[in-house]
């Protein structure tokens, strides 16, 4: 047994200079671990609620109430529990909060405790977190979906699509995939400079030039890939996070690239992009509540490309179950803070995999040096991870952890590569 003996919490800063929650767990065997909670800029309406203080302090974004909840309510409830019993601990957290959206104590408070408990149990067991959570079969390193050009809510430009990603699907190892992605990133900087475009960075470390639209952004990235000597499509594919909820208005449609479009017109736009670029994945191509549009889009192009539900599913098993029943999307974006406990996150992943949906582990735009999602990606065999550009330490921390995991696995390590995207067929 690994009995929880002490629970601590504090307010720290995330990568955008906003407060977030960090939790420490001490076990009776001397184990001491900590976990920090991320926060999003573009958030889904159906996400679990972060508890913020309001008022003037930190522009209302302080988390002292969440910290107080950990110390005054959660700590007495979990002290004495066995950290190895993750599902039991998380159920205590859910019962204690007592709300469907975790708004009383806050998902940021609950998640900090949930993740710190898992880390403590792993360390007490003498196992790395990925091995503790994933067991002996955890051996697949994910494809890094590197957001090297930022728009939408992650940048102060007129680019509507939130993330333009490169996916090094042809690399033989994770180590090589990281090198390829980093080289493309630096090549993109050179391309942007040569055209007199900004090389300032967005929230997730990608460049944030003010370009005309989606096609120009993709063309710039294609030029960067060519500059490295890598092949567009077979070596490095492309992916998008549209975050369409951000420019959708119920009753009028999608205000995208200067015109208001229907779901059908957005679907036609994506279909045309597929014919012009080697895209393996599009995240949130439509709004979180446009179920009819999602079903039609999935029926139209879902056999050719991965369609990822982020705001649509918010890592919530109930919403995912609805989507599976309707035939909406074919992949789940996994963000631990959208749902608020590790157990619920793992349940969502299991449900997705059981129904043939792919999963992509993901960071948030407001990140910390916490590397839990790197271990989680390997533990659940997601085969894909989205954690920003190969720049800024809060992003690189996850990539570096995956390098360590690949080394630890040795000869048993396998890189997911193009197998992670079975719908993608490159004709180039």
UniProtKB/Swiss-Prot annotation:
(2R)-2-phosphoglycerate binds at residues 162, 335, 364-365, 386. Mg(2+) binds at residues 241, 283, 310. It catalyses: (2R)-2-phosphoglycerate = phosphoenolpyruvate + H2O. Keywords: Cytoplasm, Glycolysis, Lyase, Magnesium, Metal-binding, Secreted. The keyword Cytoplasm applies. Transmembrane segments: none annotated. Its cofactor is Mg(2+). Its EC number is 4.2.1.11. PROSITE patterns: ENOLASE (PS00164). Binds a second Mg(2+) ion via substrate during catalysis. It is found in: Cytoplasm; Secreted; Cell surface. Pathway: Carbohydrate degradation; glycolysis; pyruvate from D-glyceraldehyde 3-phosphate: step 4/5. GO terms for biological process: glycolytic process. The keyword Zinc does not apply. One of its GO terms (molecular function) is magnesium ion binding. The active site is at 204 (proton donor), 335 (proton acceptor). It holds the Pfam family Enolase_C. GO terms for cellular component: cell surface; extracellular region; phosphopyruvate hydratase complex. Catalyzes the reversible conversion of 2-phosphoglycerate (2-PG) into phosphoenolpyruvate (PEP). It is essential for the degradation of carbohydrates via glycolysis. HAMAP family: Enolase (MF_00318). Belongs to the enolase family. This is Enolase. The gene is eno.
């Amino acid at each position: 047994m690994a009995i929880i003996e002490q629970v601590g919490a504090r307010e720290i800063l995330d990568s955008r200079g906003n407060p977030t929650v960090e939790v420490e767990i001490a076990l009776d065997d001397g184990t001491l671990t900590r976990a920090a909670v991320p926060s999003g800029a573009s958030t889904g309406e159906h996400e679990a609620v972060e508890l913020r203080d309001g008022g003037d302090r930190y522009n209302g974004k302080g988390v002292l109430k969440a910290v107080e909840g950990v110390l005054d309510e959660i700590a007495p409830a979990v002290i004495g529990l066995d950290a190895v019993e993750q599902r039991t601990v998380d159920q205590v957290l859910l019962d204690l909060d007592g709300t469907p959206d975790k708004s009383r104590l806050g998902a940021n408070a609950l998640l900090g405790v949930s993740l710190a408990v898992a880390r403590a149990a792993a360390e007490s067991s003498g196992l790395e977190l990925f091995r503790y959570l994933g067991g002996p079969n955890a051996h697949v390193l994910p494809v890094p979906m590197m957001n090297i050009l930022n728009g939408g809510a992650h940048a102060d430009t007129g680019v509507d699509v939130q993330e333009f990603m490169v996916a090094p699907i042809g690399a033989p190892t994770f180590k090589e995939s990281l090198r390829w992605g980093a080289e493309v990133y630096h090549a993109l900087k050179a391309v942007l400079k040569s055209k007199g475009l900004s090389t300032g960075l967005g929230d997730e470390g990608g460049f944030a030039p003010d370009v005309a639209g989606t096609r120009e952004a993709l063309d710039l990235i294609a030029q960067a890939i060519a500059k490295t000597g890598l092949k567009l499509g077979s070596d490095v594919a492309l992916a998008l996070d549209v975050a369409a909820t951000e420019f959708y208005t119920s009753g009028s449609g999608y205000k995208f690239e200067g015109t208001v479009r229907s779901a059908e017109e957005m679907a036609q736009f994506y279909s045309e992009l597929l014919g012009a670029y080697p895209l393996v994945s599009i995240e949130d191509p439509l709004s979180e509540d446009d179920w009819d549009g999602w079903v039609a889009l999935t029926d139209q192009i879902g056999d050719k490309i991965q369609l990822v539900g982020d705001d649509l599913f918010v890592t919530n098993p109930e919403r995912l179950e609805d989507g599976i029943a309707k035939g909406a999307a074919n992949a789940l974006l996994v963000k631990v803070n959208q749902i608020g406990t590790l157990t619920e996150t793992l349940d969502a992943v299991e449900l997705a995999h059981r129904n043939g949906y792919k999963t992509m582990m993901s960071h948030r735009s407001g990140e910390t040096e916490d590397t839990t999602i790197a271990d989680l990606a390997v533990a659940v065999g997601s085969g894909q991870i989205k954690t920003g550009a190969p720049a800024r330490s809060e992003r690189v921390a996850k990539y570096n952890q995956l390098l360590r995991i690949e080394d630890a696995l040795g000869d048993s390590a396998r890189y997911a590569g193009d197998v992670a995207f079975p719908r993608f067929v490159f004709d180039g």
